[in-house]
Amino acid sequence: MAPNYAKKCPVMGKAPSSGHSSIGPQDVHTLEVLSNFNREKIPERVVHALGAGAYGEFEVTHDISDICNIDMLLGVGKKTSLVTRFSTTGLERGSSEGVQDLKGMATKLFTSDGEWDWVFLNFPFFFIRDPVKFPDMIHSQRRDPQTNRLNPNNFWEFVTENHESIHMVLLQYSDFGRMFTWRTLSSYSGHAFKWVMPDGSFKYVHFFLSSDRGPNFKDGAGTIMDSSEPDFASRDLFEAIERGDHPSWTANVQVIDPKDAPHLGFNILDVTKHWNLGTYPQGVEKIPSRPFGKLTLNRNVKDYFSEVEQLAFSPSHLVPGIEASEDPILQARLFAYPDAQRYRLGRTLSKQASPRTSSTAEYQASLGKDFAEWVAQVSSDVWSQPHEDDYKFAREYYEILPEFRSQEFQDRMVERIVESVSQTRQDIRNKVYRTFALVSSELATRVQEGVEGAEIGQEKNVQARL
């Protein structure tokens, strides 16, 4: 017997059109088969379209009850089931997982208080701090609407007109921006969140997952991908779990008292900056982290479409004890993610009612004028404009690389930038040189000499063939 898609009664075989001379309303089974086929696929995600996923669990490993009132995180040894989806960002399904861009690691935790989504990226900061720029930023990294090919002119024009993105660009073009495997990917919330106590007091937190295996690059070896296998990371993840080699991540949290937030030397609500773990920049207070749990993936999915492709993540999926901060990019994501899922999955998308925590408004009012003025910065006219910190963070990242990693690590970053900028128009190149000069004269010179030197070399090769 063949299945009946209406789930009302079985159908004897798949006889052609049930013996009728034409397909009409009476031929219910054929119409159901065709209508089901027409609906097998759904629109792909507008970002993070290419992905892989697996099931697992989260276990609390350290007591953090002094700063946290989230039930899932209270009690060492408490376990919570979860599903995680890894993804690239800009390109479509079918593209290579090794593309040099942001990678996503989104986790849905099935807590006793509801679903809590951790929508993380593999970098601790982002390109922009003004959400109105997000569509232009994504479009600049996608295929050109005329040629349907990647166009470096679009990307570098965006960078040179939005200097807050330089910090992120340098990280993306380094080995950190290359794919290793999903199992060695660390990921970060990026945004500040609020962990709220029963009395309404709160701490600003940034939490992240450190891979217990990675990063696994050494002298660039880990950045070499087999272009003939675009899904190499998905295969690696699936096969590792199948053989019992379960990948795991340590969950860590950085904590800031709101009274201290206005005096840190940078604004933690600016997602183009990272919370200093002690590496860089100088003059910015170190914000140490503390571990609190372990995430382990231990079971593969059976049906990718229903179990991974139809997952709907959003940073608005919260549980009691956590609230979103005033970060403008985070605030925009609270709307954009559910809206994108409604478009992608339709009206049948289950509506998740996120329980509200106790209000922090009264507590915030008690923090005084300095705090109020600090929060108000995110809605000021100058928030979106470039300022010295945009160049400072990028400059110190560039300068610390030889010590933090190696000279070769820094060299490879410059080489990749040169390779990309070499594919742009001369007017764009000149803007790139001027932009990098605001960060480091050495960096600007290396990029310019690399690009123009390659151009001269190509011209000589052409002349030699004539």
UniProtKB/Swiss-Prot annotation:
The protein's annotated pathway: Alkaloid biosynthesis; ergot alkaloid biosynthesis
GO cellular component: mitochondrion; peroxisome
Membrane-crossing residue ranges in chain numbering: none
Pfam families: Catalase
Superkingdom to which the source organism belongs: Eukaryota
Residues binding heme: 337
EC code(s) of this entry: 1.11.-.-
Cofactor(s) required, per the database record: heme
Broad enzyme group: oxidoreductase
GO molecular function, one term: catalase activity
Keywords: Alkaloid metabolism, Heme, Hydrogen peroxide, Iron, Metal-binding, Oxidoreductase, Peroxidase
A Gene Ontology biological process term: hydrogen peroxide catabolic process
Active site residues according to the UniProt entry: 48
Signal sequence range: none
Alphabetized SMART domains for the sequence: Catalase
Region (Disordered): 1-22
Function: Catalase; part of the gene cluster that mediates the biosynthesis of isofumigaclavines, fungal ergot alkaloids. The tryptophan dimethylallyltransferase ifgA catalyzes the first step of ergot alkaloid biosynthesis by condensing dimethylallyl diphosphate (DMAP) and tryptophan to form 4-dimethylallyl-L-tryptophan. The second step is catalyzed by the methyltransferase ifgB that methylates 4-dimethylallyl-L-tryptophan in the presence of S-adenosyl-L-methionine, resulting in the formation of N-methyl-dimethylallyl-L-tryptophan.
Similarity comment text for this entry: Belongs to the catalase family.
PANTHER family: CATALASE
Protein name: Catalase ifgD
Species annotation: Penicillium roqueforti (strain FM164)
Gene name in the database record: ifgD
